[in-house]
């Protein structure tokens, strides 16, 4: 079952019994693809282990381009209120605030309803320990790109394996101020257990679908 890697193509290795799916870009496509897979009558996935993999942005304060991060906290960067930054109070650092709150990073926030997902940290640590000494691909182009981050020592290291929080949002964002917001947002929703290390556009959609599938015993999360 292979046809060029378009969304919802399936790739199966009968020797390793690994089943792969291409979800497509964005939380909506990811949620739809994983829900379709979970409900597909050809597969019994109630005892399957799930690993989410993909390309990501990375915080230069934590790691270099080409590094790989294992995450157990995945935070949604879209579910929020937003006020135009040109109109926010002077003592606010951002116009993003949690739903049901009146100012950014209000400690009295409502219970998460899709804003944060936590995977099994023991599995994350197991995977990290298996791979932490792996030598990653490090072509000369990476060093050239990383050299621009002169104020971030970790960004100039050869690619390496680490652990850290992940933020998923539908907007492809860039910049120091948004980077600072992402760190605070992940720390806020993880209650200080993680900060932003990598960013993507799909993972909270994947987790939401798995959570719903778990309720009908199609998967075990």
Spans of model-derived segments:
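Accessory terminal and edge-of-domain segments that mediate assembly/interaction
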Residues: 1-221
